[in-house]
Structure formats: C-alpha cells, structure tokens
Amino acid sequence: MTLTKAELADLLFDQVGLNKREAKDMVESFFEEIRLALESGDSVKLSGFGNFQLRDKPQRPGRNPKTGEEIPITARRVVTFHASQKLKGMVEQYHANKQG
C-alpha cells in the first residue's frame, strides 16, 4: 500500500477535525515548504522523522544498453532522504511485534 497526499489530507480531516479544504491545503503547503527549502539549497530536518538533503553527483561514464556505446552521464543534483534513528526504530519495533 502507498500513502498519498489525498490520503494524508483525509487523515487530517478524520483525526484533527480540519475541514477537507483546510486539510488538503495544509498537506499541499507542507510539501511546498519542503520543495522551496530544497530549491534554495537548504536541508530539511524533521525531528523524529528524517532529513531531506541535496547532494551533487559528478559526471560519470555510462553505457547505452542497446548499443554498448559509452556515453557520459551529466553531473546533477539529487534529493536524498535519510530516516531518523527514531523512525527506523519505530518501524523495526512494529515489524518485530507483528511477527512475534
């Protein structure tokens, strides 16, 4: 199962008591703030959840799988996410209890 933005908004509606429009706007604003921070080069640290960071990947050699021809893969900037130890621990604990 995948959790979508629409489902997050529904959860805010059900559990927090926001109306559907407010819940949808809150979810959209949350992700917009993360996007804006990353676009400006800032990291996003969500305590107890994890960190979003930008990482520069240098140019590297690649290969066309059809022809075998070597082609350069251009340098680029990527977004990475690292889950916090707290989040990892909670997920591991949930699965350990579920299996045991």
From Swiss-Prot:
The gene behind this protein is: ihfA
Subunit info here reads: Heterodimer of an alpha and a beta chain.
Record's keyword annotation contains Transcription regulation: yes
Single GO cellular component term: cytosol
Q: Which Gene Ontology MF annotations are present?
A: DNA binding; structural constituent of chromatin
The entry assigns this protein to a family as follows: Belongs to the bacterial histone-like protein family.
User: Under which name does UniProt file this protein?
Assistant: Integration host factor subunit alpha
Its function? This protein is one of the two subunits of integration host factor, a specific DNA-binding protein that functions in genetic recombination as well as in transcriptional and translational control.
Q: Where is this region: Disordered?
A: 50-70
Alphabetical list of Gene3D superfamilies matching this protein: IHF-like DNA-binding proteins
- Natural source organism: Chromobacterium violaceum (strain ATCC 12472 / DSM 30191 / JCM 1249 / CCUG 213 / NBRC 12614 / NCIMB 9131 / NCTC 9757 / MK)
CDD domains assigned to the protein according to its UniProt record, in alphabetical order: IHF_A
Q: Which UniProt keywords apply?
A: DNA recombination, DNA-binding, Transcription, Transcription regulation, Translation regulation
Q: Which GO terms describe its biological process?
A: DNA recombination; positive regulation of metabolic process; regulation of DNA-templated transcription; regulation of translation
